[in-house]
Amino acid sequence: MTLLSLDVVSVRFGGIAAVREVSLRLARGEIRGLIGPNGAGKTSLINAITRVVDIQSGSISFEGRDITALVPESICQLGIGRTFQHVELFREETVFENILTGLYRHYVYGFGAALFGLVGRAEEEARRECHGLLDAFALTQLAHARAGDLPFGIQKRVDMARALAMRPQLLLLDEPVSGMSESEANEAIATTRNIARDRGITLLIVEHNMRVMMQLAERITVMHEGRVIAEGSPAEIRSDRGVIDAYLGEETELA
């Protein structure tokens, strides 16, 4: 079943075409990779899906609903979450508090909720879920550390945990393991994949670590100069001469 549909979507910044008539289908529960050289339009495409940037033509649908004209807050409420290439944490807050903010839209508010004790129950449940994510991403010992004081790779793990705390149906990850060591990247990706599968979350992942991408993604979409130039299984993409030439050059093989 298709969860997300993009139909001939184009994004321009002045005279520059960042995304050129891209069409894409994501099935519910799929893990899709999105690759391409710098400037290929990958982040611009994610920004278009989450309505951070406007699209000049085309349409975007989520669960069969046209979301092209929605604002970012409405996109989030529908169950579309994301991380950013450059981490955007609350730097003065603790790791625990940052992850807790991911659950804000699931809290129960209002006089009736307070009267029947539902607010307290919801907060207790949220805290339990946060502790579970802290443990899953090996962040328990850093729960009370100020997020802004942490190394970039650890901040990336906090960002991924916070995004999963939103309980999204679709999660867009923009270079999630940049700044991590190889072992950290392997662990973070495995954790994200396992949680996503357990919860039925669809993943769209932009990542330059080709070895990680080839191991993680079920299908891969390749962009070059704003266009989709190939789509297929990791094995198909790995052996596609056009992809190798466009993405890495004549002398390099995909991992």
Residue ranges, per PLM feature:
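Glycine-rich phosphate-binding loops of nucleotide-dependent enzymes
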Residues: 1-255
